[in-house]
Amino acid sequence: MFLCVIMKYNYAIKAEMETTMEIQMWKEILTPYDLAVEELQIKFNHIIKEYRQAGVYSPIEQVLGRVKSISSIIEKAQRRGIEIDKIQEKLFDIAGIRLICQFTEDIYTVVKLIKKRKDMTVISEKDYIKNIKESGYRSYHLIVHYEVETVKGTTIIPVEIQIRTLGMNFWAIIEHSLQYKYNGEIPAHVKERSSVRR
């Protein structure tokens, strides 16, 4: 009986240690992604500041950023059949920046602005404004390579930049919630009632 209790305790300790090690491993993996998001938020916010200091209209209204949670990364990898050791090679939206604009034409101004920059390289783009998704989702997506410096050296991080208007962002939030509510199959009558999608 006593031996059984000791064995269970040892298994619990081992499991806890393995979990702690996994969390530490993920923290190390995600550190450069955190850095990329922090730096890009500062840079895009500085663009807004420069426009406003010059007394001219800024095509960027708001800057948001995030790094996917560990659970979201694992869930997406499993959904796409990506092995854990291939996640960094095959998932390009671990780091994400969202640029909110007032008007649709501002989005294309921002895209041009990003393409001119020397500190990031556009590797792919998808225009969901001219090619609206069936769900009604609209946004302009860019994947850029962005270089960060850590204590371990230079690393190139893929970052997804989503550019959209306030209205598009509002619909995207609703659409995301509806996808979960209806398990990815939004009924036609719900789409029809959600006139904001256009």
Residue ranges and their predicted role:
Residues 2-92:
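Charge-rich, low-complexity segments
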Residues 19-26, 30, 99, 184-189, ...:
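Short, structured coil/loop segments at alpha-helix boundaries
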Residues 88, 101-198:
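Long beta-strand-rich cores associated with HINT superfamily self-processing modules
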Residues 94-101:
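Terminal, regulation- and interaction-focused segments at domain boundaries
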